[in-house]
Curated annotation (Swiss-Prot):
<feature type="compositionally biased region" description="Basic and acidic residues">
    <location>
        <begin position="1"/>
        <end position="14"/>
    </location>
</feature>
<feature type="compositionally biased region" description="Low complexity">
    <location>
        <begin position="67"/>
        <end position="86"/>
    </location>
</feature>
<feature type="region of interest" description="Disordered">
    <location>
        <begin position="1"/>
        <end position="92"/>
    </location>
</feature>
<feature type="compositionally biased region" description="Polar residues">
    <location>
        <begin position="18"/>
        <end position="38"/>
    </location>
</feature>
<feature type="modified residue" description="Phosphothreonine">
    <location>
        <position position="54"/>
    </location>
</feature>
<dbReference type="Pfam" id="PF15160">
    <property type="entry name" value="SASRP1"/>
</dbReference>
<keyword id="KW-0597">Phosphoprotein</keyword>
<feature type="modified residue" description="Phosphoserine">
    <location>
        <position position="72"/>
    </location>
</feature>
<dbReference type="InterPro" id="IPR029165">
    <property type="entry name" value="SASRP1"/>
</dbReference>
<protein>
    <recommendedName>
        <fullName>Spermatogenesis-associated serine-rich protein 1</fullName>
    </recommendedName>
</protein>
<feature type="modified residue" description="Phosphoserine">
    <location>
        <position position="82"/>
    </location>
</feature>
<feature type="modified residue" description="Phosphoserine">
    <location>
        <position position="75"/>
    </location>
</feature>
Length: 269
């Protein structure tokens, strides 16, 4: 009997020690999971079996808690979203090339030729500074290349046959193909390309090209019709009188008739 009591007492002590170990291990699990960032599953224990919560369950619980507060502030947030929109953070590890375009200055402290900001929403303008025209400290925004060919010069042709200068050589150092001579180097040392203007106090005198002035042309005579007709009749009468000097006696009718008949009869035979 005493041996059976000792065995029962030992079993009870073992069961109590096992329960104590289980409770201590569960408490350690709770503390370790609560100290984490909350991204993994969370173990909750009730009186019965333990329950494991997945991230979807935690998101549902958070959505139920914040639904009431988000509904009240959604209207005000939408009104201010168009005016105040902050750029989201871009990780350098994922997009290294795109992130390098966001730098406003280069390593030497100069502004780059292009500055680009990505368009994350329609309310943000993409280009803030835009294209720069300074290359190595030289302004090249209004320069033209000698090899540049416009559409007018090459329209409808496969070869560039039109010379923009039409074969005229360069006359002066200021005669350059640039739009503005101010951007050319030392343009003021070449002098003026046009002759200077001469101002005088005297009156203006017109100078003729020739010594003989041009005279007005004589008037063309314009006679009436009856005078022209009278002159034509007079010319015809004079011509008829002149032809009388060459007048000849006409041939008699019968003589001519018989002569023509005899000739026709001989031909028929």
């Amino acid at each position: 009997m005493e041996s059976s009591k000792d065995t029962q007492h030992g079993d009870a002590l073992e069961s109590k020690s096992c329960l104590a170990n289980r409770t201590s291990s569960r408490q350690n699990k709770r503390t370790s999971l609560s100290s984490s960032d909350g991204t993994g599953p969370r173990v909750t224990e009730s009186l019965g079996l333990p329950r494991v919560l997945t991230p979807s369950d935690t998101a549902a619980e958070l959505g139920q808690k914040t639904s009431s507060s988000s509904s009240s502030s959604s209207s005000s947030a939408q009104s201010n979203r168009s005016s105040k929109v902050s750029l989201p953070e871009i990780p350098k590890e994922k997009y290294p090339e795109e992130f390098s375009l966001l730098n406003s200055q280069t390593e030497d402290g100069q502004r780059p030729e292009w500055t680009f900001y990505p368009r994350f929403s329609s309310n943000i303008h993409t280009y803030h500074i835009g294209k720069q025209c300074f290359f190595n400290g030289v302004f090249r925004g209004n320069r033209r290349s000698v090899a540049e060919r416009t559409v007018d010069n090459s329209l409808g042709k496969k070869k560039y046959d039109i010379d923009p200068r039409n074969g005229i050589p360069k006359l002066t150092p200021g005669d350059n193909p640039y739009m503005f001579p101010e951007q050319s180097k030392e343009f003021f040392k070449a002098g003026a390309t046009l002759p200077p203007v001469n101002f005088s106090l005297g009156p203006y005198e017109k100078k003729f090209d020739t010594f003989i002035p041009l005279e007005p042309l004589p008037k063309i005579p314009n006679l009436p019709f009856w005078e022209k007709e009278k002159a034509n009749n007079l010319k015809n009468e004079i011509k008829e009188v002149e032809e009388l000097d060459n007048w000849q006696v006409p041939m008699p009718f019968l003589h001519g008739f018989f002569s023509t008949g005899a000739s026709n009869f001989s031909r028929q035979q």
